[in-house]
Amino acid sequence: MKSSVLMTALCVAGSLAAEQISPPNEVVVTAKKVVVVTTTVTTTIPCPTVIPTTSYKPEPTSKPPVIPPVPTSSAEPLPPPPVEPSTIPCPEPGTSTYAPPPPPPPPTSAPAPPAPPPPPPSSAPAPPAPPPSQPSQGPAPPPPPPGKDYKEVAGYHHNVHRSNHSAPALTWSSALESSARKLAESCNYGHDTSIDGGGYGQNIGYQSGYNNVAALLTEQMYNEEAILFEGNYGNNNPSNFHSWGHFTQMVWIGTTHVGCFTAHCSNLGGQGSGGDAYYTVCNYSPPGNVLGQYAENVKPPKGQPVVTV
């Protein structure tokens, strides 16, 4: 800017002199050498101190950094005075006042309680618990002594299973045996609960070519059907009656008496039968399988060993 003013002043002075000295009609050319001096001033501004981002608000410095003014003359500029360093202390590593975020809150749920200690062993070992889908596979109790008559065998293979379902033992009834015999000896396979006035429940079954009432009661009517009743305990009106109806009548708590009879039929007729067979009928009083009463009369197994034949 100083150079521009000087050059302009010289040009104006030259013009005025020409007007005063030059005679009329005389052209005077005056050459002026104009020297333009350009001065470059380099100002070194210190880099600001980098302060790490923290959670505190830094205090203002006691003195702002001094920035030298731009010189107004063409003379050699004076060196800028030294810039006083900022009074903001640089935090030492590891000593920053930065407050870390609070730790996440603990979970609201309480820790799981410790497992209870195992119960002390009792004087008599408890029977093994049955798996959920089938009766226990522990050792079977001893079978009835040989030489037992038909009534004792049929009664045993009812009561051994009833005890596993909290049901009392059945008492043999000659009247129920008599009505069962009449149906069995008819050799006509099918239910009939009207004989001798009725009022009883009934299970029927047959075996082709052999006679084993123990296997019929324990294997076919109890073991095979008890598995199919899993999941129905506590249900007053379970479905799929034809899959487990023999089993539930055998262990029905409200039933107190039973009478059975097995007849040999050379040509068994009726539902799904035929040929030589042994036809077994068991009648029960009071009758079981009453709708709306299953939950109180058919209890889950207690885990006693499985009986097999």
UniProtKB/Swiss-Prot annotation:
Main subcellular localisation: secreted
Limits of the SCP domain: 154-284
Low complexity biased stretches: 47-59
SUPFAM superfamilies attached to this UniProt entry: PR-1-like (SSF55797)
Signal peptide: 1-17
Isomerase as UniProt keyword: no
GO molecular function, one term: lipid binding
Entry-linked InterPro entries: Allrgn_V5/Tpx1_CS, CAP_dom, CAP_sf, CRISP-related
Family designation: Belongs to the CRISP family.
Description of its domains: The SCP domain is necessary and sufficient for lipid export and sterol-binding.
Function according to Swiss-Prot or TrEMBL: Secreted protein required for efficient export of lipids such as acetylated sterols. Acts in detoxification of hydrophobic compounds.
Protein name according to UniProt: Probable pathogenesis-related protein ARB_02861
